[in-house]
A protein has these predicted regions:
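Interdomain motor-coupling "hinge/lid" segment immediately C-terminal to the ATP-binding subdomain
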Residues: 4, 8-118
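Residues that form or immediately flank small-molecule/cofactor binding pockets and catalytic motifs
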Residues: 2, 26-29, 158-160, 177
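Accessory nucleic acid-recognition modules appended to NTPase machines
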Residues: 71-204
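Short gly/ser-rich loop at a beta-strand->alpha-helix junction or flexible surface loop bordering the NTP-binding
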Residues: 1-2, 7, 197-199
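Acidic active-site catalytic centers that drive phospho-/nucleotidyl reactions
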Residues: 1, 31-34, 176, 193
Length: 204
């Protein structure tokens, strides 16, 4: 459901007593297969037809991600676009009183295009300025923070890097390949790295 009213960071200040926070992610590939009625077994035990079905399932998961409802949607891209518009973009704007949703959307698109490399907040601000969107670096930082707190993107950092490098050029990935896919025209390598990052975050 909507996260505009409460995010996980608000629980401690809203609920009294003891509580346990459990993060829920989109399906892993194993969960996706189970929900699709496909059983994962050792590759050498699969028939040719079963291998073909498994490859088809992975192709769908790789491109459209693991949101449960997307499994039954004929227009998966339309569903994911609507999900982004209604839940993520709408919730971020409502929760954080973002008056210019266009600038936020373009910033998120730039995050999608940068998913394979560390981002520079200054560079994003300059890129947006070049297309007529005048926002400061502090606003870009806030927008990225809003997207992270709303579970649209997740941040992974190089623990071996120096502190200044960690903070100034972090790497961000989308919480699901399906959400990343709607922003990209040539998505293959970006989707692959994003899928690995999601698996790392979900199981770390």
């Amino acid at each position: 459901g909507s996260n505009a009213k409460m995010l996980s960071g608000d629980v401690a200040t809203t609920l009294g007593g003891r509580f346990l926070i459990q993060d829920v992610y989109p399906y892993s590939f194993a969960e996706f297969c189970a929900a699709s009625g496909v059983q994962l077994t050792a590759p050498d035990t699969l028939s040719t037809a079963q291998r073909g079905e498994l490859l088809n399932r992975f192709a769908a998961y790789f491109k459209f991600g693991g949101f449960p409802e997307s499994l039954i949607m004929a227009d998966k891209r339309g569903y994911l676009t609507g999900l982004f518009q209604r839940i993520y973009l709408g919730d971020i704007c409502a929760r954080y009183a973002v008056s210019n949703s266009y600038s936020l959307r373009i910033m998120i698109k730039k995050l999608a295009e940068s998913v394979k490399q560390p981002i520079s907040y200054n560079r994003i601000a300059n890129i947006l300025g070049a297309v007529g969107i005048k926002i400061g670096v502090s606003t870009v930082i806030n927008y990225v923070k809003y997207a992270e707190e709303s579970w649209l993107v997740l941040r992974l950092q190089n623990d071996a890097a120096k502190l200044a490098e960690k903070e100034s050029t972090p790497k961000y990935y989308f919480c699901d390949n399906g959400l990343l896919m709607i922003f990209l025209t040539d998505p293959a390598t970006s989707l692959l790295e994003n899928l690995v990052a999601d698996a790392f975050e979900n199981w770390s």
